[in-house]
Design a protein with these regions (language model features):
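Conserved active-site alpha-helix within GNAT-family acetyltransferase domains
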Residues: 91, 116-134
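Conserved catalytic-core motifs of GNAT/GCN5-like acyltransferases
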Residues: 111-114, 131-149
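Conserved catalytic core of the tyrosine transesterase superfamily
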Residues: 112-115, 150-158, 174
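A short, glycine- and basic residue-enriched loop/turn
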Residues: 72-74, 122, 133-140, 153
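Conserved GNAT acetyl-CoA-binding A-motif
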Residues: 103-113
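Intrinsically disordered, low-complexity coil segments
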Residues: 53-60, 142-151
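Acetyl-CoA-dependent GNAT
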Residues: 7-11, 17-86, 91-94, 99-105, ...
């Protein structure tokens, strides 16, 4: 599977916003306004990427990294949204993003938060070496099937030394 990250263009944003608002993605993220995405494209501390697959470079998702110039070396995987689930694309994207965070951005810590109800993503991140740091209990409001409630955010991270150990053990591409 050929997966490519390319900088998101302003011309991609209608598609990005529609992907965020899709019913399959909405329960797991807090959608942004278009202007927030524009800011992430323009702000030097952020990286906004469109994920493309195959020779045809078909758009399949997008990614937002924040803290790319953080003086503490703490880069956040702010958002990873895919159009299609269950094909290994999320894992492939996470692996590319880890390599980018630790090799290109020289991160000390690569972190994210994931909604507790998003068990599939939690298990993916855990299997890719991310460690649970804690939970922000009932910190996000969710509406599911018309019912209003709260979900917790799970904060996870991977440190550079943990990533390098995974590379040494052959769990990451060198």
């Amino acid at each position: 599977m050929s997966l490519r990250l390319r900088p998101t263009m302003l011309s991609d944003l209608d598609w990005v916003v529609s992907l965020e608002r899709d019913g399959a993605n909405r329960p797991f993220i807090t959608p942004w306004e278009r202007t927030q995405h524009e800011g992430a494209i323009r702000f030097p501390d952020s990286r906004h990427f469109t994920l493309e697959e195959g020779d045809a470079l078909t758009r399949i998702g997008f990614v937002i990294l924040q803290g790319c110039r953080n003086p503490n070396g703490s880069v956040e995987l702010k958002r990873l949204v895919l159009q299609s689930k269950g094909r290994g694309l999320g894992r492939a994207a996470v692996r590319q993003l880890k390599a980018m965070a630790f090799t290109q951005l020289k991160a000390h810590r690569f972190w994210l938060d994931v909604k507790a109800l998003n068990t599939r993503a939690f298990e993916l991140y855990r299997s890719e070496g991310f460690v649970e740091e804690g939970r922000l209990r009932e910190s996000v409001r969710v509406t599911t099937d018309g019912a209003d409630g709260y979900d917790s955010l799970i904060v996870m991270s991977l440190l550079d030394r943990e990533y390098q150990a995974r590379v040494a053990m052959g769990q990451e591409a060198a």
